[in-house]
Structure formats: structure tokens, C-alpha cells
Amino acid sequence: MKQKDKKTEEFYARLREQLEQDTNWPAPYMYKFIVPSELDKIAEVEAAFDGTDALIKTRDSSKGTYTSVSIRVTMDSPDAVIQKYLEVSDIEGIISL
């Protein structure tokens, strides 16, 4: 296993544990992402939440290079939260906060 994969795995294991302890599911969850300010990248993030009750807000950076995407959505479980993070992680240039 590559070092990055191991660190990613450990991060999601800690997140799952924290979400299980701190939250009664289903529950609202706030995702925050930074993506390059390209319409197709923003659309990819938004598309990952199609068919949900997601409230999506975007804001461009001061120079217009990046866009902040905040998404508030009801999730069923910690595993569902993590699955969305993994789903959007394939979008080129995305940063999950």
C-alpha cells in the first residue's frame, strides 16, 4: 500500500469514528470543497449531490482562480458521508476541507 493511500485510509477511519460518536444519524452534514473556477469542475461537485436535499452555495476567490463550494445535506450514516468524499475525490484539482 502506498503511503498516501494509508494516510487517506487512516483519515477516513478517524472521521468515521468521530462521526459515529458525535452524531445521531441521519443528520445534516456540511461539506466544504475548493475547486478551480471552471464551470465543469463546479458542476461535477454539484452533480455528486443530485437527488438529495442538498443546499449548495458557491463563492469565488478574490482573484477568481478558485471557487468554494459549501454543501449542506442530510446524510444517513458516517459511511455515506465518507462515500461522498471518495466520490468527489476523483475531480481534478478538488480540495476537501
What is the meaning of each model-derived region?
Residues 1-68, 74-97:
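Long, contiguous binding/interaction regions
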